[in-house]
Amino acid sequence: MIISAASDYRAAAQRTLPPFLFHYIDGGAYAEYTLRRNVEDLSQVALRQRVLKNMSDLSLETTLFNETLSMPVALAPVGLCGMYARRGEVQAAAAADAKGIPFTLSTVSVCPIEEVAPTLKRPMWFQLYVLRDRGFMRNALERAKAAGCSTLVFTVDMPTPGARYRDAHSGMSGPNAAMRRYWQAVMHPKWAWDVGLNGRPHDLGNISAYLGKPTGLEDYIGWLANNFDPSISWKDLEWIREFWDGPMVIKGILDPEDARDAVRFGADGIVVSNHGGRQLDGVLSSARALPAIADAVKGDIAILADSGIRNGLDVVRMIALGADTVLLGRAYLYALATAGKAGVANLLDLIEKEMKVAMTLTGAKSISEISGDSLVQELGRSLPAALAPMSKGDAA
């Protein structure tokens, strides 16, 4: 299969992966309206084309939390990454490291902190959920500090798991799930050999290190379901802020008032995110939510954004809407499932190329020159038609 664009990796991943894994990452919550709008809304953001600007000195380099990034992109935390390629977290992290951008390890990664961190030249980031078991949270934070992780990404939009209907149909959950997954693996021999057999152990490394025993897929589902904490509040985060010495980023912000609360709390950054449309269907896409949040807190806190970003043009759009940096999730996982480290490396090269084309044709020589002025105002920052709040009957 020819890979000429980031979107090609999705089709390739669907061929490679057993359905329960493909649909787990590809799907969203409920009827998946927000999942689709994340992509659709961002695609409607119109950029101003500018010409004759002498773009010979164009640079994508930027600085975030005292780290130099080759471009304003980081790899987002994605659970079960090691089920998509053999020791997938190690491979994805290596590609990000070689590109000069951060990799974020998920709490529920297959490969533990101690396996991934020593393979990298630059410090990785670590993501943590709000969980009832505070002992696990402290243990994970201690291990992340010991491994030299620089930035903590604290996910707050998952006090309870979203209703993901695709999972029951695909075999990730539902009746006879284990038998269905086994049969799917048999029907996908490339994955079964590379990951199913040679990618073991298939436990959740960060959790296994704490519990002292392997945790398989069923254990993962059960343990997480019993440990998400709906009682969490800003006050419960104070001990984490005191414990963690480095930058702390709050992930899962969609409302300007929550963004202001993050500033008052003392966070170093926020991620404007709806969890890739995987938590609550019907909420704003990140592209819809970002401009108002940027108006509220830009300059007071670093603004990152995810959800719906599929290519370099989308990165430029998000920055023009108010983000400082973006996180890639599904896009890099499709590439990882297709070709491992080489796939992620090629994806990042494609995104870099697409960003350079977009910046050259909009007259932005540097990341700091991408702003609201880069947008066609009728379809730009105000976005009265494309990105106005959804009205009744407006669902796609």
Curated annotation (Swiss-Prot):
Q: Binding of substrate: at which residues?
A: Y24, Y129, R164, R278
Binding locations of FMN: 106, 127, 155, 251, 306-330
Catalytic residues identified in the record: H275 (proton acceptor)
Give the source's domain of life in one word: Bacteria
Location of the protein in the cell? Cell inner membrane
Q: What is its EC number?
A: 1.1.-.-
The UniProt entry, under Pfam families, shows: FMN_dh
**A single GO molecular function term of this UniProt record:** L-lactate dehydrogenase activity
Key words of the record = Cell inner membrane, Cell membrane, Flavoprotein, FMN, Membrane, Oxidoreductase
* A GO cellular component entry from the record: plasma membrane
Cofactor(s) this protein cannot do without: FMN
Q: Which GO terms describe its biological process?
A: aerobic respiration; lactate metabolic process
- State if Chloroplast is listed as a keyword: no
Q: Does the keyword Lyase apply?
A: no
Q: How does it sit in the membrane?
A: Peripheral membrane protein
List, for all copies, the residue spans of the domain called FMN hydroxy acid dehydrogenase.
1-380
| Reaction(s) this enzyme catalyzes, per UniProt | (S)-lactate + A = pyruvate + AH2
What SUPFAM superfamilies is this protein classified in?
Answer: FMN-linked oxidoreductases
InterPro entries the UniProt entry points to: Aldolase_TIM, Alpha-hydoxy_acid_DH_FMN, FMN-dep_DH, FMN_HAD, FMN_hydac_DH_AS, LldD
| Family per record | Belongs to the FMN-dependent alpha-hydroxy acid dehydrogenase family.
The cross-references to HAMAP family, in alphabetical order and at most eight, read: L_lact_dehydr
Q: What does this protein do?
A: Catalyzes the conversion of L-lactate to pyruvate. Is coupled to the respiratory chain.
| Protein name in the entry | L-lactate dehydrogenase
Q: Which organism is it from?
A: Salmonella schwarzengrund (strain CVM19633)
